[in-house]
Curated annotation (Swiss-Prot):
InterPro entries registered for this protein in UniProt: PdxA_fam
Record EC number: 1.3.1.53
Natural source organism: Comamonas testosteroni
Keyword NAD annotated: yes
PANTHER family in UniProt: 4-HYDROXYTHREONINE-4-PHOSPHATE DEHYDROGENASE, D-THREONATE 4-PHOSPHATE DEHYDROGENASE
Protein name: 1,2-dihydroxy-3,5-cyclohexadiene-1,4-dicarboxylate dehydrogenase
Recorded family membership: Belongs to the PdxA family.
Role, per record: Involved in the degradation of terephthalate (TPA) via the protocatechuate (PCA) 4,5-cleavage pathway. Catalyzes the dehydrogenation of 1,2-dihydroxy-3,5-cyclohexadiene-1,4-dicarboxylate (DCD) to yield protocatechuate (PCA).
Length: 315
């Protein structure tokens, strides 16, 4: 069955992690025609080493590749280094630019290692922040949406303390996240999603028993979204609404509200989309797995599902 119909850019992520390996393993499962629609970005040396470890040297012969990101040879599997962090950003940036210029239709990036990127002196809080910076957007305009196990969960806030998230949350930020997610649902074949907005506090504050945040932030956002003609329920307790599984799109206020259910139900099969910009970028719902890098045992399931998700036939 053909799963790739769109042109995709595939950045290999941290070259010292499992990115090069899972990229090759996923590509091996595609037909030659499908592989011809995917351009790989990253250090060729890391791909060569991964191919040797996985005995996939023949796959490199028809790989469409663009060198992006400098890397000392050989790759230092499992090592967290500034050079690998810089390479991660360089390869992802090149892929984003290719999409922005119309060379490809969407971008997929293998896992990064945040510490390596910070050691390179680069401000970074995940692929959404990188996408925003490359496109010249405010970071508040790009959101993370996890897709897996039949769930689609957009995050209004992401990699920050709970205190910082509460200070930043506003009705408009919630509205912007939902608008971006609804547009993305259309791209994914769900044009009129039923939306559920999680409360900030337990039980969506139980009236105002557990705080004023939901009456001041999420409830006004829901009212605005309904006036725009969207089918939105909430705010509701995340535990209750997820148990019901009646909605197409869920809106998490905080990182763990969205990550825990996805990682519980789809530990190796989730996609992580950065949405809200003119370029759609997706990574996978797991990390760079430095502890198993270079051993040939990494699972490419999540990456293959992400390729299928973004490579699907439009409409």
């Amino acid at each position: 069955m053909t799963i790739v119909h769109r042109r995709l850019a595939l950045a290999i992520g941290d070259p010292h992690g499992i990115g090069p390996e899972i990229a090759l393993k996923a590509l091996q499962q595609l037909s030659a025609t499908e592989r011809s629609l995917i351009k790989v970005y990253g250090p060729w040396s890391a791909l060569e080493q991964a191919a040797q470890i996985c005995q996939m040297e023949s796959l490199l012969q028809d790989l469409i590749h663009e060198e992006a990101g400098s890397l000392a040879q050989p790759a230092q599997w499992g090592e967290i280094t500034p050079q690998a962090g810089l390479s991660t950003v360089q390869s992802a940036t090149a892929a984003i630019r290719a999409c922005e210029n119309g060379e490809v239709d969407a971008v997929i990036a293998c896992p990064h290692h945040e510490t390596a990127i910070h050691r390179a002196g680069i401000a970074f809080s995940g692929y959404p922040s990188l996408l925003a910076n490359v496109l010249g957007m405010n970071e508040d305009e790009v959101f993370l949406m996890l897709v897996g196990a039949g769930l689609r969960i957009v995050h209004v806030t992401l990699h920050e303390s709970v205190r910082s998230a509460l200070e930043r949350l506003s009705p408009q930020l919630v509205v912007d996240a939902v608008d971006a997610a609804v547009q993305t649902c259309t791209l994914l074949g769900v044009p009129k999603p039923q939306v559920a907005v999680f409360g900030i506090n337990p039980h969506a504050s139980e009236g105002q028993l557990f705080g004023l945040e939901d009456s001041q932030i999420t409830a006004p956002a829901v009212e605005t979204l309904r006036k725009c003609g969207l089918a939105v329920d909430g705010p509701m307790g995340a535990d209750m609404v997820l148990a019901q599984r009646k909605h197409d799109l869920y809106v998490a206020m905080l990182h763990d509200q969205g990550h825990i259910p996805i990682k519980l139900l789809a530990p190796n099969g989730a996609s992580a989309l950065s949405i809200g910009g003119r370029v759609v970028l997706s990574s996978v719902g797991h990390g760079s797995a430095m502890d198993i890098a270079g051993r040939g045992v990494a699972d490419s399931t999540a990456l293959l599902r992400t390729i299928a998700l973004l490579g699907a036939q439009p409409g």
